[in-house]
């Protein structure tokens, strides 16, 4: 669509032969794909898979997508390690647990094992229990089956059962 608009605006620039026209359109599509990619990345960082999906959704050809992604990587506009590191830091600040963060990274096409220093630099058992306890501090204790409901709540936030259990036990003992 974007390429078509540019072509329509500048019909005089089209070469006369078919092969030259095809090459011209292919070149134009690659430039437009890269321009769109930079525009998307100017708003926030994305993973390579997210960018590829966005470009595909805009109707760019696979070769244009590949070219734009490669150019963005070489220019360091697109960096999965940087994206993943920022993503994990941000989600930890929001109170997400390790399991939920890993699932979300995989959904976004990033393998957590490829993140430098993951998980040691981002998580430790003590801080996980503290973050889980902080989430519970904002939640009222249900009257019916409080242990099960609070553990389920923490597990839905991505905390392991053992961390959720410890945090809930601390909260219930403190408030009893």
Report each predicted region and the residues it spans.
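An alpha-helical, amphipathic repeat domain used for nucleic-acid recognition
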Residues: 1-176
């Amino acid at each position: 669509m974007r390429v078509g608009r540019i072509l329509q605006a500048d019909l005089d620039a089209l070469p006369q032969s078919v092969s030259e026209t095809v090459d011209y359109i292919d070149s134009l599509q690659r430039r437009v794909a890269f321009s769109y990619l930079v525009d998307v990345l100017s708003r926030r960082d994305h993973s390579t898979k997210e960018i590829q999906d966005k470009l595909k959704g805009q109707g760019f050809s696979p070769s244009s997508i590949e070219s734009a992604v490669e150019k963005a990587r070489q220019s360091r506009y697109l960096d999965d390690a940087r994206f993943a590191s920022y993503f994990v830091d941000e989600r930890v600040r929001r109170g997400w647990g390790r399991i939920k963060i890993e699932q979300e990274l995989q959904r976004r096409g990033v393998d957590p094992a490829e993140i430098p220093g993951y998980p040691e630099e981002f998580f430790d058992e003590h801080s996980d229990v503290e973050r889980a306890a902080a989430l519970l501090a904002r939640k009222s204790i249900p009257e019916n089956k409080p242990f099960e409901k609070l553990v389920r709540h923490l597990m839905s936030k991505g905390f392991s059962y053992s961390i959720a259990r410890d945090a809930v036990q601390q909260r219930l003992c403190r408030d009893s």
